[in-house]
Regions:
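Glycoside hydrolase catalytic-domain context in secreted enzymes
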Residues: 1-816, 821-836
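Short beta-strand elements
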Residues: 837-850
């Protein structure tokens, strides 16, 4: 009998043939790994999961919990909430049969133009790393693996597959590697390598996969590639890249077997990769190591024994974080998941401005004019591979009407946020075959023969790896009946990539080829081109609609098909829409305008071209504010946008992409039932010209991080420019006073304890985020003006004082100089409630370190 799980795993590796081992190192399909029944190894399922766990398919028939975006979670500054968020994600993964969650995304928000920032936490490495560590621990307590991504410096989307990032050592270690180190030291079982190159070497071949990842941080898990990121056989195999996704086709397979046999790649390198994969399988429960399991599967246990012994079960494994005994595997109910989503959404809502309008009285205003496309159809998540399909989305209109059943809530859609279509709601469609709500989807072969027919309940469909073999056409058919609020003429359309043919009542109305914006998977699937046609509709006379999509492009050949049937915003005069909305606002006690970004603005696959709100939303806000001085603006975006009217309205709330319960959460905040607990995890500029680090576009294939260690608020402080709202900013419904700052001498392990008292001086319970920053103005080396060193979210009743202790680890005093070094002497310690609101100051004296 072997003494440890690792010894048993090594024995199993030695008993496999080269072909068996190599086969394990490329995915079986888009979302799962290869099984090896002979050793009790089942396939492991991987799924995107930064803000909800999709599972192996996007399918409304198996919906997912849509949690608030990563920026919303980061805005809570609450590690306990991050832990609970991770626990719910693990429960969702188990419900979906998922072993590996592909998250958290812990790239930094280097420039506010980054198109995927909604999926990442912050511009600050410490805040990002602390949240990531809490999430990773919570997910893995349930024997589901977490996957910090994208390692490393994939902080942009433009040319992400080919761009080379050029940066100095200090920026690399102090900023971009730091969150990954925190996640790995928290016990992460996987790390995802990025598409981009760093210093001329693509990340799936980069020596950074070895040092510092494995040599300095002791990472013993699996390095999985981003999808289709591995481009080579020998170079990637000789690097510490372990698993190629997706499969079964890839650059390894038979070519890697040949490379090993020729001596170009040592077999020992393959053995190490397989060992890591088996270790992951054992951790998530995908590998049965018992003798009986091996014998039941026909495996020769003597062969295992000949390599050092037989397999074992339930013996200690060398784990950064111990595998739990299963006692933490209790399911989270649907209700509990939705309540957590609601809590996080409220806790992450940032009150940017309040002139006394909020909170409303518990009974609410008598009449409320709710204005804006996002008030009716909120963006609950960003676009791209992380998209999930929730069972239900609560809009602000829904939330207010539920919270205030006696109030008069009137609605105006405002102005279009973007071009494109909104998927037809289930209630407006009838499957012509069954007569039930929904549509009929059929895959046809080249001769028109039916390969698959199914009823679907959503008009936005994504097929990933589930397209039948031989399919040449996807056909959608439904009977469309417009809703009661639809105009007499609608623009009915389709979004997709490929040749599109649409018929209405048997007449061809569209026959064209559509392309997709952005790059590869994310944008091509979630922001494709649109074709639409105006159709006169009568609610008493529904119309038959048939759409056919030819499956001829590269994505379809890879089994990736996406199509949406919906209505396009009518091409009305924006000025007329603004006037209508303002007139409505003038009749109400108060007005709420919801503004935001669209899927063509914030999505995986491309970066933003401007920070301005799309369309005529700025004009809309100003007109409504003139018509009703009690105007509250809600910002529904994943990252910073410009708010030029911010001083012209009564209140501004930032809800990010708030998840499926965002409407309930926002109603809770407006009515004061819940504190707007958020504080900014990123700096919000007043103008685009003020932003010190803006470009996300490579020059001749190279993106140069010329700013070094000065990104985010560090860059703003260095430039001496005042933003609209600084990092860490956020108001509440109470007032606070911080006092009694004390800074300890370094403890034996180098930790410096910062203590203070936080007193709620307001008339109601509230939340505050106490933030501690360091500075070293007399430093002999280049440093930021200030940098975040620690934080704590605290709550207190009216008049209550609470003690706060924030421990500063030695690393926050250190800088990178070929290794971690600490400049001896006094560091200024600043405590307060944002990077610029720091009323308390002390000093920490530290010795040299390295």
């Amino acid at each position: 009998m072997l003494d440890t799980v690792d010894e048993a795993l090594r024995a199993l590796v030695g008993a496999l043939t080269l072909e068996q081992k190599v086969r394990l190192l490329t995915g079986a399909d888009l979302w799962s790994t290869v099984a090896e029944p002979a050793i009790g190894l089942r396939s492991m399922v991987l799924s995107d999961g930064p803000s909800g766990v999709r599972g192996p398919v996007w399918d409304e028939r198996d919906p997912s919990l849509n949690l608030p975006s990563a920026t919303a979670l980061a805005a809570t500054w609450d590690l306990d909430l991050a832990r609970r968020y991770g626990a719910v994600s693990a429960s969702e993964a188990k419900r979906k049969g998922v072993d590996v969650v592909l998250g958290p995304t812990i790239n930094l928000q280097r420039s506010p133009l980054g198109g995927r920032h909604f999926e990442a936490y912050s511009e600050d490495p410490l805040l990002t790393g602390e949240l990531a560590a809490a999430y990773v621990r919570a997910v893995q307590e349930h024997r589901v693996a977490a996957t910090p991504k994208h390692y490393v410096a994939n902080d942009f989307e433009t040319e992400r597959y080919t761009a080379d990032v050029e940066l100095d050592d200090r920026a690399l270690h102090e900023l971009y590697l730091a969150p990954f180190e925190a996640a790995v030291r928290a016990g992460a079982w996987l790390v995802m390598s990025a598409y981009n190159s760093v210093r001329g070497i693509t990340m799936s071949e980069n020596p950074l996969l070895t040092t510092p990842l494995r040599t300095s941080w002791d990472f013993d898990g699996v390095t999985v590639s981003d999808w289709m990121a591995v481009r080579s056989t020998e170079a990637a195999a000789k690097a510490d890249q372990d698993l190629v996704m997706p499969g079964p086709v890839g650059p390894w397979g038979e070519r890697l077997v040949a490379a090993v046999r020729s001596g170009a790649v040592p077999e020992a390198a393959i053995d190490v990769k397989v060992l890591r994969l088996l270790r992951l399988a054992q951790r998530v429960g995908a590998l049965d190591l018992s003798d009986s399991a091996l014998r039941d599967n026909g495996f020769d246990t003597a062969a295992v024994a000949s390599h050092g012994g037989v397999a074992v079960r339930n013996v200690p494994a060398r784990e950064p974080v111990p595998i739990p005994d299963g006692s933490q595997d209790a399911d989270v109910s649907d209700y509990e998941g939705r309540e957590l989503a609601r809590e996080v959404a409220a806790a992450g809502t940032v009150l940017l401005r309040n002139s006394g309008e909020l909170p409303w009285p518990s009974s609410g205003p008598g009449s409320i004019a709710v204005i804006g496309e996002a008030a009716i159809r909120p963006r609950t998540q960003g676009g791209g591979s992380a998209t999930v399909v929730p069972a239900e989305v609560v809009s602000l209109v829904d939330g207010l009407r539920a919270a205030l059943p006696d109030a008069t809530v009137t609605v105006h859609p405002g102005v279009p946020v973007q071009t494109g279509i909104h998927a037809l709601p289930r209630g407006s469609m009838t499957d012509p075959q069954t007569g039930e709500p929904g549509l009929r989807a059929r895959f046809l072969d080249a001769d028109g023969g039916e390969l698959l027919s199914e009823q679907r309940y959503a008009a936005q469909l994504v097929y990933l790896g589930t397209v039948p073999a031989g399919a040449a056409t996807l056909e959608l058919s439904t009977v469309y009946r417009p809703g009661p609020d639809e105009p007499a003429t609608v623009r009915l359309g389709v979004a997709g990539v490929g040749r599109i043919h649409m018929e209405i009542e048997g007449d061809t109305v569209i026959d064209t080829v559509l392309g997709g914006g952005g790059e590869m998977l994310g944008a091509a699937l979630f922001a494709p081109d649109v074709a639409a046609v105006s159709v006169a509709v009568d609610r008493e006379r529904p119309v038959s609609v048939v759409v056919r999509l030819r499956l001829e492009n590269d994505a379809a050949a890879a089994g990736l098909v996406a199509i949406t049937l919906g209505t396009e915003a009518a091409h009305t005069d924006p000025a007329g829409a603004v006037a209508e909305a303002a007139a409505l606002a003038g009749t109400a006690d108060t007005a709420v305008v919801v503004v935001g970004t669209g899927s063509q603005t914030e999505s995986e696959g491309y970066d933003r071209t401007t920070l301005a709100l799309p369309g005529a939303q700025d004009e809309l806000v100003r007109a409504v504010a003139r018509a009703n001085p009690r105007t509250v603006v809600v910002v529904n975006s994943g990252g910073p946008v410009l708010l030029p009217w911010r001083d012209e309205v009564s209140a501004v709330l930032l809800t990010w992409f708030g998840g499926q319960e965002s409407g309930h959460a926002l109603a809770d905040v407006l009515l004061g039932r819940t504190e707007p607990g958020g504080r900014l995890p990123t700096t919000w500029p007043a103008t685009e010209a003020d932003v010190p680090v803006l470009s996300t576009t490579p020059e001749d294939g190279v993106l140069r991080y010329r700013e070094g260690i000065h990104i985010g608020y560090r860059a703003w402080l260095r430039a001496g420019v005042t933003p609209a709202y600084p990092f860490g900013h956020g108001l509440g419904y109470s007032t606070w006073e911080l006092a009694d700052l004390a800074v300890s001498a370094p403890e034996q392990d180098g930790t410096v304890a910062v203590t203070l008292t936080a007193r709620n001086t307001g008339a109601r319970a509230g939340k505050q985020v106490v933030q501690v920053y360091l500075s070293r103005p007399d430093s002999a080396i280049e440093r930021p003006v200030r940098w975040l060193a620690g934080f704590a979210a605290v709550s207190a009743s009216a008049g209550e004082s609470v003690p706060v202790r924030i421990d500063l680890p030695p690393r926050v005093f250190a800088h990178w100089d070929g290794g971690w070094r600490t400049e001896p002497g006094a560091f200024a310690v600043h405590a307060g409630t944002s990077v610029v609101d720091l009323p308390l100051r002390g000093s920490a004296v530290v010795g040299a370190g390295g």
